[in-house]
Amino acid sequence: MIKYGILFTKKKWGIYMLKSWTPGEMPDKEEMKMQLEKTKSRLYDLQMKIKEHKLPVLVLFEGWSAAGKGSMIGKVIKNIDPRFFKVATMSSPTEEELRRPFLYRYMKQIPEEGKFTFLDSGWMEQTVMDVLTGELEGELYEKRIESIRRFERQLTDNGYLVLKFFMQIDKGEQEKRMKKLLDKEDTKWRVTGADKWQHKHYKKCENVIDRYMKDTNMSTSPWDIIDAKDKKWAELQVMDTLVSSIEV
């Protein structure tokens, strides 16, 4: 396991949540390139172990707008046989889904034995949005959190590997990335009104996210905060965590 910054401390669950988190030291480019190739190769090899041991792996990617959640999933799945994974991007719930228990639509995405499911945002994003809009507070919030903790515990108790990544960038980096997208005709559509609102209210969103992460950080399904300012460094952190978690 690579002993750089966050990778070295990630198993100390319950300590490094968002507001108290600081990025680890990024390795030099040559070291990073070498380690990334090793972890990619190892992840490719571990597919058969996952299949043989019938290990279902659920990987949840959360993070700030423009932090690179979708592109990171794209990089990871390049190293996995398409037969062994699926990717789910969770849009706004339908009317039918709103009538069902909150976690219903996520339960439908859990992986089969020996396969991966990668979720591009999930129950964290929806919960944070519900808090920010005032729909979820007090006892309702506590019940939601307890249902999420119970859901994740049930998965891990039944042999699922649950990994939760939060792609972290600061407000300045987010502004820079959004401006780059908005400046080009073919990419400006990617910045939504919700993205702009989040950027304007970055601190408020950070407070809600930080509380949520503390409330749902468990030894069996801890949060891994990924320093996403540098894309290659972010990829190495994610790949190393995937490999080391499967090898345990």
Predicted regions and their residues:
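Charged, amphipathic alpha-helical linker segments immediately N-terminal to NTP-binding catalytic cores
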Residues: G14-Q35
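A glycine- and Lys/Arg-enriched "phosphate-lid" helix/loop adjacent to the NTP-binding pocket
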Residues: V131-S147, R153-N207
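Conserved lysine of the Walker
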Residues: K69
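Conserved nucleotide-sensing/catalytic segment adjacent to the nucleotide-binding pocket
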Residues: A88-M90, E95-L140
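NTP-dependent small-molecule kinase module
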Residues: C205-V248
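Post-Walker A helix-loop "phosphate-sensing" segment adjacent to the P-loop in P-loop NTPases
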Residues: N79-K86
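Hydrophobic positions on the alpha1 helix immediately C-terminal to the Walker A/P-loop
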Residues: M72
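Pre-Walker A adenine-sensing motif
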Residues: R42-K51
